[in-house]
Amino acid sequence: MGSSGSALRVCADHRGGINWLSLSPDGQRLLTGSEDGTARLWSTADGQCCALLQGHESYVTFCQLEDEAAFTCSADCTIRKWDVRTGQCLQVYRGHTSIVNRILVTEDQLFSSSYDRTARAWTVDKGQVSKEFRGHRNCVLALAYSAPKDLPSDPCLEAAMGAGLLVTGSTDDTAKVWQVASGCCHQTLRGHTGAVLCLVLDVSSHTAFTGSTDATVRAWDILSGEQLRVFREHQGSVICLELTERLLYSGSADRTVKCWLADTGERVRTFPAHRHSVSALKYHAGTLFTGSGDARARAFDARSGVLQRVFRGHSFVINCLQVHGQVLYTASHDGALRLWDVRGLQSVPPLPQRPATKRSLSRLFSNKVACAAPVPLQPA
């Protein structure tokens, strides 16, 4: 059943649910974005809040933290850049006409996705739109980017791919691959029969993995647009994906995580024990951490599938996880950031797998709202 984890600290400064949590590349700071319209910076050294970022006029949907700057996006249709030392707003990016769902910051560009059916590329320093990607017929959610250095060196394709490729997932049931240099659609990835909620990109093989409300994960060649594989064993929406060491982990509304061989689509292992949708995944040093709509985080030995620890304390869905050193950080719709001691998690031998049993679900995960429904907390 797994032992209970102890909370090192509870940070309850936000006055609304936390929608996202980002760790800086140097590991010194955390950034949280909240329903209360603010973001906060936290020190990983002592867990103290070191800056309050105020300025958005509606809730913060997503955030990304770099070493020198923090980036947030909001339902107020804007993106903001902040100084991590002073908390001062350095730039406001305006142009979207509806909720901004996601942002992705690279060395000199910022990409965004929105309910206005577009994705956009911005110059980071000037805050100007450099390209607008139009073609989706509904809300654009997920984003991934393949830099020019990760793409084939082909003189015939240099003009098209010279600025890299952007991959977007939408509630129109498709993903699209865009040429960043021109803004043109390079490929449309058709095959899903439900909204594309999440995607991850394996840049070395030019493969995108997409998760959908149709309960499948699909693998695509982003250069040719070919569908390579379909991963079919989930019984509910696929909400989150994690790719590491040629293994793909998928978290679902069917209350399980599945581990797949990324190159073949073979299901290697199923991680049960959740009492609600699996809302977040994080792999770290041989341990798979999960967050769930049952308000708990869990630590599984990634190789054996054994549940090692359950982290209890939140009262609402866990939206995001990060791990730094020997500390697990969990951000929840209850408004709290919790810090947990993860020392002592040991690898154990793999267990034989039983045949998967199918179950029906009374309702599927529908983006943020379904996973945020309060559920009775029962002993794990």
For each predicted feature, which ranges?
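Terminal intrinsically disordered, low-complexity extensions flanking WD-repeat/beta-propeller proteins
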Residues: 303-310, 315-380
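Residue-level detector of Asp-centered blade-edge/turn motifs that repeat once per structural unit
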Residues: 25-26, 65-67, 105-107, 147-152, ...
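WD40/WD-repeat beta-propeller blade N-cap
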Residues: 11-18, 54-60, 93-100, 134-140, ...
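Conserved strand-to-loop turn within each blade of WD40 beta-propeller repeats
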Residues: 33-36, 73-76, 113-116, 169-172, ...
